[in-house]
Amino acid sequence: MADIEGLLHEVADAVISCKKEKVLEAVEKARAEVPPEEIIEKGLSAGMNQVGVLFERGKLFLPHVMMAADAMTTGVKLLEADLPAGAEKKLGVIVNGTVEGDVHDIGKSIVSTMLQSAGFEVHDIGRDVPIRDFIEKAKETDADMIGISALMTTTLQGQRDVIELLKEEGLRSRVKVMVGGAPATQAWADKIGADCYAENASEAVAKAKELLL
């Protein structure tokens, strides 16, 4: 029997290399010995998490992340047929965007990519998003969580405004709120009544799982 840990390691490394062919090859090799859920969680997702860490350390750039996510998705698609019925159920629905007045996109995009890779259904509504649009999208998608990014101190208030509007609409008890972005902190999240603060993409995935699973 092949070394399962070694096979999963190969899958993770293939994702980090951002090469689809490598991922397909490694997944094909692993599926003979390893259950599909395990390949997704301990191979593909583990590799993607590592990509997130490397991105945060400045060792990889956004194009690499997008290519790795693409390569990972190819691997997941290959395994879909092997998954037991219902196994591909999404972990939860998340609306993610950057508040109005803020045109920064990169951090938020990587968070969306990582959440998607972890198995959440993510609706990325982009940057410079009006407060009401967060709420409307959450209603439309029946979201479990809203992720609000702000990259400037001047736009931080938008995070509070989304929470206030959720309360006004009677949705606050049903929809969790995660805040992030350079000027955001845990103290700020506590002050405005957010459910959690995430410093980076890996943390965003961990916190989302904590709150929604």
Curated annotation (Swiss-Prot):
* Similarity comment: family membership: Belongs to the methylamine corrinoid protein family.
Question: Can you tell me which residues the record assigns to a coiled coil?
Answer: none
What this protein is called in its record is Dimethylamine corrinoid protein 3
- State whether keyword Metal-binding applies: yes
Matching CDD domains, A to Z?
Answer: corrinoid_protein_B12-BD
Q: Where does methylcob(III)alamin bind?
A: H104
Q: Which InterPro entries does this chain map to?
A: Cbl-bd_cap (IPR003759), Cobalamin-bd (IPR006158), Cobalamin-bd_sf (IPR036724), Corrinoid_p (IPR012741), Dimeth_corrin_MtbC (IPR048095), Met_Synthase/Corrinoid (IPR050554), Meth_synthase_dom (IPR036594)
Which pathway does the UniProt entry assign to this protein?
A: One-carbon metabolism; methanogenesis from dimethylamine
Q: Which organism is it from?
A: Methanosarcina acetivorans (strain ATCC 35395 / DSM 2834 / JCM 12185 / C2A)
Role: Acts as a methyl group carrier between MtbB and MtbA.
Domain of life of the source: Archaea
- Per UniProt, which keywords does this protein have? Cobalt, Metal-binding, Methanogenesis, Repeat
GO MF annotations for this entry? cobalamin binding; cobalt ion binding; methyltransferase activity
Which biological process, per GO, is one annotated for this protein? methanogenesis
Record-annotated B12-binding domain positions: 92-213
Q: Which NCBIfam families match?
A: dimeth_corrin_MtbC, pyl_corrinoid
Annotated gene = mtbC3
Domain B12-binding N-terminal: from-to ranges? 1-91
